[in-house]
């Protein structure tokens, strides 16, 4: 485990301990630190990174401010967005980082950023981090078509934990995701580093599906703990 992975794990474990102080929906990334590690090894500051509701590891991988992230989750004015965004919607323009609570909500925005970079002299690319459930949104497939049609420097990183909340992927989808993506003409990879390098070097879209195992609850927040404590008796 590298220093970055250790930092991320320590941050998330600390949040678990202080979860009774958190009053915004919070999705921890315990078990997915290696994804951030691989991303950090290839990203440059100029890259645009679009994340999900489970974004802490992505943000720290991009070089984000750990203390400001903590303050934001705690709802403090000193947070990244003044305490108004909470965990799910953090934005840090200084490092081109954006997150959204909506499943698949930023894939189209990531494609737009890639479109703006298409004819740029910059070496930057657009990176969209998503979960497997995002592939159940129509915009995901529309973006694949658009990215191939216009040769967009867009790298899509899918963290597939096999679940949408508690519904297993076998209950929601038929077949594997990567072959469907490849059918659009998108170059698919098994390594995050290879996918990012391909998009950067060739200015073309890429896709990588990383199988991960989330080692914590889907959602953590103080109000859920309170609900458990105040649950009505069953009889």
Labelled PLM ranges:
Residues 149-158, 185-187:
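Short, proline-centered helix/strand-breaking motifs
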Residues 50, 125-130, 155-157, 207-211:
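Structural motif
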Residues 16, 21-150, 168-183:
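Cofactor-binding active-site loop characterized by glycine-rich and histidine/acidic residues
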Residues 27, 188, 207-209:
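Structured core elements
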Residues 120-122, 171-199, 228-235:
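Conserved thiamine diphosphate
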Residues 57, 161-165, 214-216:
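Short gly/pro/ser/thr-enriched loop/turn and capping motifs at secondary-structure boundaries
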Residues 198-235:
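Glycine/aspartate-rich loop-and-adjacent alpha/beta segment that forms the canonical ThDP
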Residues 1-25, 45, 225, 232-233:
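Cofactor-/ligand-binding subdomain signature composed of acidic, glycine-rich
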């Amino acid at each position: 485990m590298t220093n970055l992975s250790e930092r991320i794990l320590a941050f998330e474990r600390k949040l678990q301990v202080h979860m009774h102080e958190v009053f915004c929906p919070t999705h921890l990334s315990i078990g997915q630190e290696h994804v951030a590690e691989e991303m950090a090894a290839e990203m440059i500051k100029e890259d645009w990174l679009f994340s999900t509701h489970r974004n802490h590891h992505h943000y720290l991988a991009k070089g984000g401010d750990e203390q400001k992230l903590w303050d934001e989750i705690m709802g403090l004015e000193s947070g990244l967005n003044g305490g108004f965004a909470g965990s799910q919607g953090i934005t840090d323009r200084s490092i081109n980082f954006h997150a959204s609570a909506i499943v698949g909500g930023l894939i189209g925005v990531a494609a737009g950023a890639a479109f703006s970079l298409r004819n740029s002299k910059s070496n930057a690319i657009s990176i969209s981090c998503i979960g497997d459930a995002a592939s159940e949104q129509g915009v995901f497939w529309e973006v694949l078509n658009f990215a191939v049609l216009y040769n967009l420097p867009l790298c899509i990183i899918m963290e597939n934990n096999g679940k949408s909340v508690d519904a297993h992927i076998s209950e929601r989808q038929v077949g594997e995701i990567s072959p469907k993506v490849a059918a659009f003409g998108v170059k698919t990879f098994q390594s995050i580093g290879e996918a990012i390098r391909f998009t950067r070097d060739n200015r073309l879209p890429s896709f990588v599906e990383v199988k991960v195992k989330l080692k914590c609850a889907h959602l953590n927040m103080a109000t859920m703990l309170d609900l458990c404590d105040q649950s009505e008796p069953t009889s």
